Regions:
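Metal-dependent nuclease catalytic core centered on acidic motifs
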Residues: 28, 114-297
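Nucleic acid-processing catalytic cores of prokaryotic defense/repair systems
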Residues: 56-57, 73-80, 240
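Short acidic loop-to-beta-strand element that houses the catalytic metal-binding Asp/Glu
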Residues: 76, 86, 91-111
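Histidine/cysteine-enriched polar flanking segments
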Residues: 42-48, 102, 107, 340-347, ...
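Elongated alpha-helical scaffolds
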Residues: 64-73, 78, 107
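Interdomain/boundary linker segments immediately adjacent to catalytic/signaling cores
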Residues: 1-66, 119-161
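Charge-dense, extended regions
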Residues: 287-362
């Protein structure tokens, strides 16, 4: 069944300003859109029909969060588990999956897809919108670096800047390799735009890039919040143990060091204030898995560097205060646990995450 059917009219244009993923998938016949629909439809077809239909509707309402649920469910299946979606718990809550593995061991898994560094993400999305609009204006033989972009939040607000950029692009001479880069700046109602044209004589299409977005990373804070979430804890308490929290970690989200710090604690390198030489390294065990013995999760399954085109193999972080027999398919992942420090055990299996056959397109 095609839960995301092919559009009836051809439209290979890219996504437009503030268009949602679902809106784009509904109208676009671009090869990438076709590939995304194929991945989703194929993945949904692996689930029981009732659950697949329900998850499809959820994807239309909140694509990113429920895409992660789809990926986790499929990954459990790839690991050899038979899954029961949304089983009723002893306290009338429902966990995302109860998984029975090939060795007979049962585990429950709850998924969480947090939005990390949201303000920075909004800024980068706005920059991407402006870059797409300016790509339509050219030029082809110059690479345009955004040194500064305005605070435009709609196509109408950005249109005066586009008009000025077109005039600037039209004034550019034939590029000379290693020639001086022309610079353009214009102040409008939504702030200043600064562009630098870098000679690129062999270019065949418009190329815009930058600016760098700086921000204070809140990944550790958001990871801790996921473990403190009252509803998630309630779901875990009502589920068949051991219960694992699967966390979505996109490229712009937390890495393994963020998880180490959030769950176990922080390694501190003490240095002499004058010479800068190290005086010794200590470990501050202030992570939630160490300080909060009431956490009902047996561990966290971190899906690192996850996107629709691939991912790193998940890493299993174990709660040091819970001792359960683990399914062999989970225990064979790279695991980390706190003893007197962070103990890491390498994976004993080949990576399997890409057996999901993520989105592929030319």
């Amino acid at each position: 069944m095609d839960y995301f059917p092919e559009p009836t009219l051809p439209d290979e244009s890219g996504s437009v300003w503030d268009e949602t993923m679902v809106e784009w998938l509904t109208r676009s016949t671009h090869p990438r859109a076709r590939a995304v629909r194929e991945f989703i439809n194929r993945s949904l077809s692996c689930f029981p029909p009732k659950y697949a239909d329900s998850l499809s509707k959820k994807l239309h309402d909140n694509f990113q969060s429920h895409l992660f649920e789809l990926i986790v469910g499929r990954y459990l299946q790839v690991l050899g588990a038979e899954i029961e979606p949304e089983p009723l718990g002893t306290n009338n809550t429902r966990i995302d999956f109860r998984a029975t593995f090939s060795d007979g061991v049962i585990a429950s898994v709850e998924c969480v897809s947090k939005q990390f560094n949201q303000e920075a993400q909004r800024t980068m999305a706005r920059h991407e919108n402006m870059a797409r609009v300016l790509d339509d204006a050219g030029p082809t033989k110059w690479a345009i670096e955004f040194r500064r972009l305005p605070e435009a939040r709609s196509p109408d607000e950005f249109e005066p800047y586009v008009d000025k950029a077109r005039s600037f692009y039209a004034s550019l001479p034939e590029p000379i390799a290693d020639g001086p880069p022309p610079i353009f700046a214009w102040e409008g109602d939504r702030g200043q735009m600064e562009l630098e044209a870098i000679p690129f004589p062999k270019g065949t299409k418009a190329n815009h890039f930058g600016p760098v977005v700086t921000f204070m990373d809140n990944s550790i804070e958001r990871l801790r919040y996921a473990l403190k979430d009252f509803q998630k804890r309630k779901q875990a308490i009502g589920a068949v143990p051991p219960v694992f929290l699967a966390i979505d970690c996109p490229f712009n989200g937390p890495d393994s060091e963020d998880f180490d710090q959030a769950l176990f604690g922080q390694t501190v390198d003490h240095r002499d204030m004058h010479s800068g030489k190290s005086l010794g390294i200590t470990f501050n065990p202030n992570g939630l898995f160490v300080t909060d013995k009431g956490i009902p999760f047996a561990g966290v399954l971190a899906f690192l560097k996850l996107s629709m085109v691939g991912a790193a193999d998940p890493v299993l972080y174990l709660n040091p205060y819970q001792r359960w027999k683990l399914p062999a398919a989970l225990a064979s992942h790279e695991t980390r646990v706190w003893t007197s420090g962070i103990k890491m055990t390498a994976a004993t299996r080949e990576p399997t995450i890409n057996l999901l056959r993520f989105v592929e397109y030319n």
